[in-house]
Amino acid sequence: KIALLNDTHFGCRNDSPAFIEYQNKFYQDIFFPYLVENNIKTLVHLGDVVDRRKFINHNTAHNFKKVFWNKLEELNIDTHIIIGNHDTYYKNTNEVNALQNLNISKDAKIYTRPDTVNFDGLDILFLPWICDDNHDDSIYAIDNSTTTIAMGHLEVKGFEMHKGHFNDQGLEKTQFNKFEKVLSLKIDPDEEYCSGFLIIPT
């Protein structure tokens, strides 16, 4: 069993105290109790853990550690984080990112480049934010992967980003036709499946 999170955007809305309280309530009252009740010991985060690319507010960082990260460590959760575009400082590389600078556990697995990860015999292709630095490796991984499932923080053409506004940048949906399931960030609340895509709610 694997828990999935994405687009948590710690520090959103200008580090709004109201949003911090709202997010904390979700983790304390819903998310972590669910992991315990269902004996889930693995978490995959599909990217955009934090909100700002350039910096993080001290209170937001403190809250992230106290409410989220310390609890993952307390429960001994095997944590995998796929870097999203909001997690990375530069636009052309994922190598300078918030997660590697927040002093989180050395046991956490952070993915800045495509990688195939095995969970109890099932291979899953992880695809972090595709940028100049990892573009060729990402395309090669997509084209040559033998996995049936891909997870990532993807920009794909043709999905509705906002009502009436369809994304015209990124990869073509057809590039993922080989996969039985592709799990990525939520785009359109009315479009749960599209050419094999399972769109994950934020």
Residue spans of the language-model regions?
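Conserved catalytic scaffold of divalent metal-dependent phosphoesterases
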Residues: D87-K178
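Core catalytic region of metal-dependent phosphoesterases/phosphodiesterases
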Residues: T8, C12-T116, F179-L198
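Extreme N-terminal starter segment of soluble prokaryotic enzymes
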Residues: K1-A3
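Ligand/cofactor pocket segment of small-molecule handling proteins
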Residues: I200-T202
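Short, small-residue-rich loop/turn micro-motifs
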Residues: N6-H9, L154
